[in-house]
From Swiss-Prot:
Record InterPro entries: ATPase_AAA_core (IPR003959), IQ_motif_EF-hand-BS (IPR000048), N-DRC_Component (IPR052267), P-loop_NTPase (IPR027417)
Region of interest: Disordered: 338-378, 457-484
Superkingdom, taxonomy of origin: Eukaryota
PROSITE patterns, sorted: IQ
The keyword ATP-binding is assigned to this record: yes
Key word ATP-binding present: yes
Sequence ranges of Basic and acidic residues compositional bias: 338-363
Organism per entry: Rattus norvegicus
The protein, known as: IQ and AAA domain-containing protein 1-like
Gene from which the chain derives: Iqca1l
Binding site for ATP: G569, P570, S571, G572, M573, G574, K575, K576
Comp. bias intervals (Basic residues): 464-479
Family listed: Belongs to the AAA ATPase family.
Keyword tags: ATP-binding, Nucleotide-binding
An example Gene Ontology molecular-function term: ATP binding
Amino acid sequence: MSEGTYQRLWEASHATLEEVLEKEPSPLEPVLTRERQSFQYRISVLYLYYLGLLRRFNLAYDQMVQPQKRRLLRRLLDGVAGRVLELKDELVRVDLCETHCLDRVLQELKLTPVDLEVPIPKYFQLEQTSTMKARQQMLAEILARLEPLASQENLRGMSRTEALIIVQCAERARQGRLRATFMREIRKEEERDRRIRENGRQKFSQDQGAIVIQKVWKGYLQRKRIEQDRRMEMEFIGMLPSSSQTTRQNALAQAFVGEESRRTRQVEKEEEFQEAIAKTHESLTETEGPDMKERMKDQIRQWFIECHALTGRFPDYPDEASGGSYLIFADKTPEQVRQELEAQAQENKKKEQEKNKDKVKEKKEKKKKKTKEEKAKKDPEVMFKVLPSKSIPVINAGHEEFTSIWKSRYDNKHPSQSFDSETLREEKRKQVEMEIRVQVDELMRQELRNLRLAVDREETRPLKSPKKKGGKKSGKKKKEKDLTPDRSVDSLFEELVVIGLIKKSLLVTLNDYIGDCLYLGSTLTLANKIPMPSLFDIRQNIALYGVLRLGSHDIHTMAPLVRSILLVGPSGMGKKMLVQAVCTETGANLFDLSPGNVMGKYPGKNGSQLLMHIVFKVARVFQPSVIWIGNTEKTFYKKIPKEERRMDPKRIKKDLMRATRQLGPGDRVMLIGTTERPQLAEMKGLCRFYERILFIPRPDYASRYVLWKRMIENQGIGVQQTQSLDISALARVSDGYTPGHILQSIQSVLTERRLLQLTKKPLVASEFVVHLAKLDPVYREEEESLKEWFYKTPLGKKNIKFTKDQQEAEEARLAKEKKKKK
């Protein structure tokens, strides 16, 4: 597509953005219980609109060439992504669950389930920093050094005699198979000759033979024509893809080449822009800098004189933390500036006096909070209040910049998509002015001291820096003591790789986690039934909680803080695959703190503390990082089994929880735990540590259908070869089986030999059922046990309580209606 196409897409996106910003709820708006459904609908609509905007901005940022527009697009893209995460948090608070049934909203907005897909910004992988690339290269080098040692340990020596015996066995087996095939053919020929001798050969006349040949040939031709006509009809109505695969592949290849060429142009234009930035800054500093400096000095001197004339003394110069001389240039009179400075001094005195009264106030505030909470509990109408957004100011600023600068500016002046020199000079002029202001402030402070000595005979008074606003002591973080001050981070990184705590993740994308969405979620909700999440919902939640937050520092800062996720589900549901997908999509390090992997490493009394310190220190420096804890129930065991007491799986628990609490906004470190048996863990500790708990049930029919279809196609089988395969029957039969089971059965059936036979022997559903029957499914009792545990989590309890309240209210309403009818 051309640059004009992306420009029009950008303009259309801003038109939509303007409408969406008008629909935003006001912050701290109370949400009443009776308004819950309407508020849920509003938030759902906003969520879907912002998802669409995220998709458009992602495409525009990836393909637009002009460097200044791309900077604005990047801020908008991060702001919209942050808003999507905030709305997701609001939906969880309203729905009291991690699964949101938006099928009714999709239908009313005339959208499709594809619009529910969370787009992952492409720049997460394309614009990885040099630090991340160097770290990946360092990991590859360390693993390459370790591979020969591991292979030497694993390989067992073999004598010449043993090798000869193995070769002889293989050769004899080959000759035996060949001999058996030859004898089978001889027996077939003998059997055929025997039948001919017994029955006699049927004799045909020339005409009869011709008729038989014509019949067979005409039947063959007619079947081919009917098959071709059916194929054309199915392609015409869109039920089958076009048979011309080469045309489609050529179109995709051409589009890929076009995208890559635009990305190459982006790099070229960015280099030009960086050179222009340096030249413009230097030019403005040389040409306009001296005039700016003199003008500022004159203004400040005039302010000194006016203040002295009004008050009889020279003013206190604003310090740098307050803005310095910027306060003087903000269109204020000397009297106003003096009043502001005096007000600041009085406030500082008041704060010092109020320090002694803080304890009394805290007690009163606690009492007030208790009374408010009691009132809120007594008042069932108020559910919660809308939280203020950190992303909307960023989005508003970006939208205003687009409206004021780029909306009315066309690309006729710069068809080559080069930077706009006028806009660049305006931006750099402000920067140069700020730099010169700092220099002028230093000079004028000294001049003010000299004036006080010469005119008022005052000695220099030390300027007190304004004290920071006092916050609650509980909110302050204690600075963590560095237990490895004499070690470089690179050496610590290498040490963790060598002992196996840092591992290389497999290249798995989030789209490889196959699943379909829940189509009847709203229907189940209206029937007061709790819908189970589909595999599509799990993939979306991982994209929201894991990928978007770890991919960008700005998004992580704006989004609600989520430090840990727990994935609960039976074996074979792809929990570890999701962890690796997060690492692949964001380029994150993978730390393995599973109890089995930690066993025997950093022993001793303080070994656990040192281990957590090194892991989190390296994870923070080389962020983004994912800390995976497999079989996490062992870390939170209620009672450690006898056979696992040597492992001591709970030894890192306290230090792990302490280190996790130190993570804040901007620390792109995510802890992801996986478990199949959460019932063995202490419920309170597990739920307190993991902030988000995602339950992965057995796949439903829609997900199983997509799994069978996609997994078979991924084995190199085209759509035409699977026409005779009843995938719907396979999806029905495989109820209770996990994606891992389905993949095992497909790999068992589709061997190399079977793939070669597809042209003569099409696939049949019974082939897969035979192998599937050999595997143990997830029994209903196991899933019910996991559900019962999940409903005991804090969010699960709230959901159950809310559902029961709704059922009771519905029963009461029906009872009233019956009484009225009587």
